[in-house]
Amino acid sequence: MRKFFSMRFPSPVSVQWLADFLGAGLVGDKNGQATGINEIHKVEQGDLVFVDHPKYYDTCLRSAASYIIINKAVEVPPGKAILIVDQPFEAYLRIVHHFRPFEPAAKMISDSAVIGRGSYLYPNVFIGHHVTIGSNCLIHPNVTILDHCVIGDNVIIQAGTVIGPDAFYYNTKKDRAVWYKKMASCGRVVIEDDVEIGAGCTIDRGVTGDTIIGKGSRLDNMIHIGHDTVIGENCLFAAQVGIAGAVRIGNGVILWGQVGVSKTLTIGDNAVVLAQSGVPSSLEGGKIYFGYPAEDASVKKRELVWIKRIPELWKKVMAGRPEEGRPKAH
């Protein structure tokens, strides 16, 4: 079972310090130590989260998160603390920018990057700050690997691919001039061992956690993987597959060309989705799917056969009706 990492602070941070830093009211366990900041769907003990809508108060308070930035005084569960501010989203941004500040790049390969033995980088490869690349990797021209991303051993990345751009993820409020405010992305991309990624792909970093490509997987050209998506081992994706954010894909999954996968769903182990299918909801493993919405391929193909026969069947139906009962042409 994979462990999903949040953005960790360099060392545990006093919740009292956080309250002072944010100018927040502090209620609950005032002696706690926050270890990192995370999203609500994958928090763990010691994590800090924010919530700014009553709809999600209860979810946050009942989650594993130890510390909640919130915009209303509420009853605090035992062992937790809340930090009360007017704008929790802005407080989240302040914390992220403090612990993960912007670092200008002065070189094509950062001095803080670690590159393993036997790895070869073609000309015009950009390697950001605090990137780790394993042994015996081959990174083709014009690849960009942005800050804090992790590349395993024996990985091949073809030309023009970008690893670690910001998540397409926004705080949305329509009562302000700018409806969509950018969520600062402080997560990573982790490419495990023995992965090959084709040309012109983009793999977004997690908002606070990791986007993961599992060991032995193969990605064709021009594929997009959204933030916080976790892809299992030995998966095979053909060209122009698009996967939205926070998707969980099992081991041995095959997605053929131009398959589109919607956000926050799960595809089970060894599922196969045929070309140009759309996946709007979770799929069980071990089956072959086709169409939009993607369904069992054998059922979908039979449906298509019957759809093609509609004109023929319509003629037969009309041929058996009396003249006065037939619909009139307009």
Can you say where each PLM-predicted feature lies in the sequence?
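Structural signal for interior beta-strand "rungs" in well-ordered beta-sheet cores
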Residues: 50, 107-296
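Terminal amphipathic alpha-helical/low-complexity segments used for targeting or macromolecular assembly
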Residues: 1-107, 111-112, 154, 160-161, ...
